[in-house]
């Protein structure tokens, strides 16, 4: 679920109250749940998208509203949010499971936030670099920052974006590198 921003693919920040965002999340997840059920599959997790995700990572009121909306749906869904962000505390307060997420293909600021996509180097597209970062996140719980430092990340899941030119190759390389490092990928609902 994300902001109602079709033209900007949900990546533009919008002025929406926490209550409106929670209602949008409930509507979007409810629709997706119905589609999944009609197709005979089970919806297991929910992840806010784009600007909504980024705002919820730093806006406690929004994070809490989204977490309560997920809880109110009563579908047993795992909420996915940026590791170390306001989403973690919000999920705890709402009494729902949260999968802390890290990004192997995005640059981090030293405070754990993602570097704005408007900055050069914010999206990492080199296959080997992304795979190496994924292993560092999964095995060591840390990643290099935009300014060359390191931050710790307690992540349950690693995201790679599907809209980069080599997305499929990156995803394969990440899985192969993580498995080669002795880490066995598991479904979120089994580990959170």
Predicted regions and their residues:
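Flexible, glycine/charged-enriched surface loops at secondary-structure junctions
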Residues: 36-44, 142-152, 182-191
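C-terminal domain-boundary segment and adjacent tail
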Residues: 77, 169-192
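Catalytic beta/alpha-barrel core
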Residues: 21, 55-58, 73-83
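Glycine-rich tight-turn/loop motif centered on a GG-T
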Residues: 7-22, 75, 113-125
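Active-site rim beta-loop-alpha module in soluble metabolic enzymes
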Residues: 84-142
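Glycine/small-residue-rich loop that forms an oxyanion/phosphate-binding "nest" at active or ligand-binding sites
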Residues: 5-48, 55
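Structural preference for beta-strand elements that scaffold enzyme active sites
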Residues: 43-47, 76-80, 97-99, 157-159, ...
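Charged helix-capping and loop-helix junction motifs
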Residues: 59-65
């Amino acid at each position: 679920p994300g902001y109602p921003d079709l033209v900007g693919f949900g990546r533009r920040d919008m002025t929406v109250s926490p209550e409106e965002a929670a209602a949008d999340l409930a509507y979007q997840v409810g629709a997706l749940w119905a589609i999944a059920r009609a197709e005979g599959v089970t919806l297991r997790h929910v992840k806010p998208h784009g600007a909504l995700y980024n705002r919820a990572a730093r806006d406690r009121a929004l994070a809490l509203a989204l977490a309560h909306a997920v809880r109110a749906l009563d579908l047993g869904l795992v909420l996915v949010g940026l590791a170390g962000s306001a989403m973690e505390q919000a999920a705890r307060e709402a009494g729902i499971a949260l999968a802390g997420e890290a990004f192997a293909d995005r640059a981090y600021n030293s405070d754990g936030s993602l570097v704005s996509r408007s900055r050069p180097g914010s999206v990492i597209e080199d296959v080997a670099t992304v795979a190496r970062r994924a292993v560092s996140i999964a095995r060591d719980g840390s990643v290099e920052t935009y300014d060359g430092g390191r931050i710790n990340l307690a992540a349950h899941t690693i995201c790679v974006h599907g809209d980069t030119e080599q997305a499929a190759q990156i995803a394969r390389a990440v899985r192969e590198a993580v498995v080669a490092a002795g880490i066995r990928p598991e479904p979120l609902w089994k580990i959170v």
